[in-house]
Amino acid sequence: SVKEKLSDMKYEYEIEAEFDYIFKHSGQSHAYAPIVASGKNACTLHYSDNNQKLKKGSFVLMDIGARVSGYAADITRTYAYGEPTKRQIAVHEQVKNAHEAIIDMLAPDLGIEEYQRNVMEIMGAAVAELGLVKSPQDEKVMRYFPHAVSHGLGIDVHDALGRPRYFQPGMVLTVEPGIYIPEEAIGIRIEDDLLVTEKGHRNLSRSLSTGW
């Protein structure tokens, strides 16, 4: 896997090239322009240069998905390059815990507005736990979590879900919490692709390790 080969790579573009090879060797293609962002580059949400040298002791964020049979995947993992600091591990753990808590909520008939409120409570608590804001309700939470947690996924990477009031079986969406701390050069996001089922949900990308 790319995670196992990461320590042998020196530049962001080498990681991108590894995915290029894997996808083309399988007769598939990228669903969108890949993001390979190390260190502070991960704080730029749609970073696309993918040309910086990897630095030991940093995290590498990889937002990459294949297009297979016309359908897109959209997956993000953030892995350590070298030995991470306690602070980096703490941020990663908060994102991982939030990711799991948000996924656990997904079920048919869950209200979209309720989902959004719960997401902000979870992310607010995570950001506050890291000492970045004074309380989970602080408006500055959005400084460290500045994007939506989910979008529809299908033929288009950002597929339209319509305007439903509740989640419904058959919907496919991403769950992608992240915490970005530019002043500490830490940007961590974990993203999976979820199918809402009759009884709950199915994680379509669960086989990929979410650990650091």
Where are these regions (language model features)?
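Active-site neighborhoods and metal-handling regions in enzymes and metal-associated proteins
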Residues: S1-W212
